[in-house]
A protein has these predicted regions:
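Glycine-rich phosphate/pyrophosphate-handling loop used in enzymes and phosphotransfer proteins
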Residues: 1-194
Length: 194
């Protein structure tokens, strides 16, 4: 039975991808082993051993609490002032019961970074080797996990960490924007780079 045009094109693309993979094999970012055709950027063994933070399961975690302390310090008190209590800031007392905090911002990381662990090659390749596709891939991986948790479903926007313009000019990209793009794709919400 003859194949349809789309089936023939898909089969042809798979053959071309297999030939390219034979000539220029794709390898796991973490361990360097050759990837199977179904694997992207990381092999199944390394993906199974990835030291996941599971921060996405908790609305309050070490990362988000530190992030919100920075928000409070910079937005409410100024960069060098110590945190104020509600009675010291009467205009904020009605806005935040029990404390003078900005609305809570969630934060999560996919995996724990250790300088000596082989997983250090993931951010290294994204940041210094220009592996933007890996950034998007791991962003989608985190985004899929975030969307399983109720407290992330009200997220409205993703804001990547800005990169100083001289570094962005030298590198040609901001790795945080690549990760944010993957997050946005998985979560169905926009990214703001401005």
């Amino acid at each position: 039975m003859p194949c349809t045009l789309s089936d023939c094109l898909l089969a042809g693309m798979k053959r071309i991808a297999a030939a390219i993979d034979l000539l220029l094999p794709r390898t796991c970012i973490v361990c360097g082993t050759r990837l199977l055709s179904s694997e992207r950027h990381i092999c199944l063994l390394c993906a199974g051993e990835m030291p996941l933070t599971r921060f996405w399961k908790q609305s309050h975690n070490l990362m988000s609490d530190r992030f919100n302390d920075i928000i409070q310090k910079n937005l409410i008190n100024g960069k060098s002032a110590p945190p104020m209590s509600c009675h010291e800031m009467p205009e904020a007392a009605d806005a935040c019961p029990g404390s003078c905090r900005e609305p809570y911002a969630y934060a999560a990381a996919l995996f724990t970074y250790h300088a000596e662990a082989p997983f250090r090659f993931i951010p290294y390749n994204i940041k210094y080797k220009g592996d933007i596709r890996a950034g998007e891939y791991f962003g989608r991986m985190l985004g899929a996990r975030l969307m399983r948790e109720e407290h992330w479903k009200d997220a409205e926007i993703i804001i990547p960490v800005p990169l100083h313009w001289t570094r962005k000019f030298r590198r040609g990209y901001n790795q945080a924007e690549a990760i944010a793009s993957g997050l946005a794709s998985a979560m169905g919400i926009p990214v703001r780079n401005d």
